[in-house]
Amino acid sequence: MQQAALVGHSMGSLIALEAAARSPQRATRLVMVGTAYPMKVSDALLNTARDSPLKAIDMVNAFSISSLACKPSYPGPGIWLHGANRALMRRMQAGQTGLNLFLHDFQVCDRYANGLQAAASVSCPTHLILGSLDQMTAPKSAAPLAAALQAQVHMIDSGHCLMQEQPDAMLASLKASLA
């Protein structure tokens, strides 16, 4: 593949940013979802992730979803977004032997210090899709990055889990970003 549109959510948005900066000739679009820069993680969450990853999963789950009752019956009757997210995070954590995946990923986000320098190297059209109710990556924390990238910002009435909370609005914003 010679060229691609790069899309990432949260930590993945920083990865997409870095990839677009390192190979600007290959990035046709950059879409950063649920992003912030710097993407600092609180000491309380870092310490909890280190000492009690399952408790940190519960904390993140509470901070990432803005409603107890998201889109009716997402993705179908009987599904509970909070429970599904918790189960997925626990499964990912348990699948790593010898590595505290939750702590590792938070440390990567917390320590990433190349955002504005990377933004200066990005030459493709860039869009930020943000959740207006996001407590993990607050929209105001994305403002310096949006300015540096001259990005178009799409705001969705959602928390950090935009894809699950507002799938239709997220898809519409993504389609507009890639058009």
Question: Where on the chain are the PLM-derived regions?
Answer:
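Alpha/beta-hydrolase fold nucleophile elbow
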Residues: M1-H9
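Short alpha-helical segment within the catalytic ATP-binding CA
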Residues: S10, L14-I15, M136, C161
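Flexible "cap/lid" loop of the alpha/beta hydrolase fold
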Residues: L14-F63
